[in-house]
Regions:
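Short beta-strand edge/turn micro-motifs at domain boundaries
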Residues: 1-3, 139-145, 162-194
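Short, low-complexity N-terminal intrinsically disordered segments enriched in polar/charged residues
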Residues: 2-12, 16-71
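Short solvent-exposed loop/turn micro-motifs enriched in small/polar/acidic residues
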Residues: 47-48, 122-124, 160-162
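Short helix-to-loop capping/linker segments positioned immediately adjacent to catalytic or ligand/cofactor-binding
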Residues: 53-55, 112-119, 155-156
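A solvent-exposed, acidic/Ser-Thr-rich amphipathic alpha-helical stretch
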Residues: 71-144
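Flexible, surface-exposed loop regions and adjacent strand-edge segments
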Residues: 84, 197-199
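Short, cysteine-centered beta-strand-loop-beta hairpins and adjacent loop/turn segments enriched
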Residues: 150-160
């Protein structure tokens, strides 16, 4: 996992970065009226994407996992957890576009990768996903939140992380794609061990 936001990422998509910089930690609909507007069928469809993503990662099917991301998709792990608003003005544990994600996948597949001898394995345990709001109000897509436990194991040692996923999903040619996956770790501000795979 990269130790800070990669400078090249910031120049790849100015519009996406501008939108991401406005992503603030907010709660699900603040009224019963907002909750009533949530479409259960839409919520299930989006939750299925999140569950599929976790299953592909657990199975080590990284190429298939990449196809779940939109062309301008991002993977973001804030250094400050849920309190962090901006991925550019403040360092992040990871802030990666499709190109950087693809490079990481290629490294994991490389039989000469020293950090993968023996290979890392992972397990995602998800709670029920919840659609935050019925409408796509910020242009990023529909936001879904999913509390999680993540276990990564390698050579007899395990790492346990917990937190909440925030996925923004958009419909592309009739298929739901991940525009942004934000991983808010519960203890993001403490020293973390090296994570080889994707949380």
């Amino acid at each position: 996992m990269s130790a800070a936001a990669n400078p090249s990422t910031a120049t790849n998509s100015a519009s996406a970065t501008s939108a991401l910089a406005t992503v603030a930690p907010t709660g699900r609909g603040s009224s019963s009226t907002a909750a009533a507007l949530i479409d259960p069928a839409l919520e299930r469809a989006l939750a299925d994407v999140v569950a599929k993503e976790a299953a592909l990662l657990d199975d080590g099917r990284f190429d298939d996992w990449l196809t779940l991301y939109a062309d301008d998709g991002r993977y973001w792990v804030p250094l400050q957890g849920a309190a962090q608003v901006d991925p550019i003005a403040h360092n992040s544990l990871a802030f990666e576009d499709r190109l950087l994600l693809t490079l990481r996948v290629e490294r994991l597949k490389n039989p000469r990768a020293h950090s993968q001898q023996p290979r890392s394995r992972c397990q995602h345990v998800l709670q029920r996903s919840a659609l935050v709001e019925a409408a796509d109000r910020d242009g990023l897509g529909h936001e879904l939140r999913t509390p999680f436990l993540y276990v990564e194991s390698r050579d007899g040692e395990q790492v346990l992380l917990t937190g909440c996923y925030r996925h923004w999903l958009v419909e592309v040619d009739g298929t739901w794609k991940i525009r942004l996956k934000r991983v808010d770790l519960l203890d993001a501000d403490r020293p973390l061990p090296a994570i080889q795979l994707f949380i």
